[in-house]
Amino acid sequence: MHPIATAVVAAFAVFAPAAAQEPARTARIERIDPALDTLIAADAPIERVATGFGFTEGPLWHDGKLWFSDVVGDKLRTVDRAGKVTELLANSGGLANPPAGASIGSNGLIPDRDGSVLMAQMGARQIVRVDAAGKVTPFLSAYQGKRLNSPNDLVYAPDGALWFTDPPFGLFNGMDKDPKKELPNNPVFRYAGGKLDAVITDLKLPNGIGLSPKGDTLYIADYGQATIFAYKVARDGAVSDRRSFFTFPKGPGGGADGLKVDLRGNVWATGPGGIWIFSPAGKTLGRIHMPETAANLAFGEQGDALWITASTSIYRVPIKGVGALPMFAR
């Protein structure tokens, strides 16, 4: 989730005007290290597949289409390879009578074991299941009797545990200062065996989330610190040895928001100007400069395509078969 502009709260609320005012930027791929050549061609086309949305987020390749959220339009949609857009669910954020322009739609999406999709609802402050017909059923909404902040992004670990970030972006009356906020912090949660644990509680604005191929390294993009943090993950889900994986320089066009980890353990993350690609050791391999502010990304098709949600549009970039599809993807 990316705070572009605000008319409701400082740092996070109204997206459409800011998206319309973005300065013109040239789409291109920047090769910083020769290792990038094994991941993506320097002349790979950056294709705008669909446009005209409020602010796009939460991309997921599922059932042969890209599912995505419009956090301002408050809709869940799909788009196919040909650019055909289908509305799957209106009021995807689940909040009755939402204020105009607030970022309270749905956000992160991930396939679940039964073929449905888990969806983070910023407005209703919960995670729900959505089936192919758009039917919604509750999944997670509280921790120790207190309502979640506004779940943002999700990932399944190889052991079947669900991890997700819970920043206050959907609390549109001041985020951390919103009187409706019940949790004392902005946790990273792990759900396994029917039990929800707040594993990390000391980040400012935890946002994007990803795991290494073996599930032994957890990556969290903290928008509030412009940093991707990495943690060791034990078999029981305990985390340790936090380190700063990468701190983004200041710049226009995005921040520490969405991220994904490919089959080789490379980290693809949104940052200023577009998508940044890092080796497992944190070395910058290259960048995809985007014409709009990128909020999130997803590997799709046969692992040979990168789909990007960026402001008002959906983009696709061919890659070299390294994309890791999420667990339970089909």
Kindly give the residue locations of the regions a language model identified.
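Blade/loop signatures of beta-propeller domains
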Residues: 21-45, 326-328
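Short, conserved, GDST-rich strand-edge loop motifs in beta-rich repeat architectures
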Residues: 22, 164-183
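Flexible "stalk/tail and boundary" regions
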Residues: 45, 63-64, 79-82, 113-114, ...
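Beta-propeller fold detector
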Residues: 47-50, 86-93, 137-141, 198-201, ...
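Beta-rich, blade/repeat-based domains predominating
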Residues: 50-65, 94-121, 144-162, 182-188, ...
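Short loop/turn segments immediately following the C-termini of beta-strands
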Residues: 71, 122, 167-169, 223, ...
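A short loop-to-beta-strand structural motif that recurs across blades of beta-propeller domains
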Residues: 75-77, 126-128, 186-189, 227-229, ...
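Short loop/turn segments immediately following beta-strands, especially the blade-tip
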Residues: 231-238, 319-326
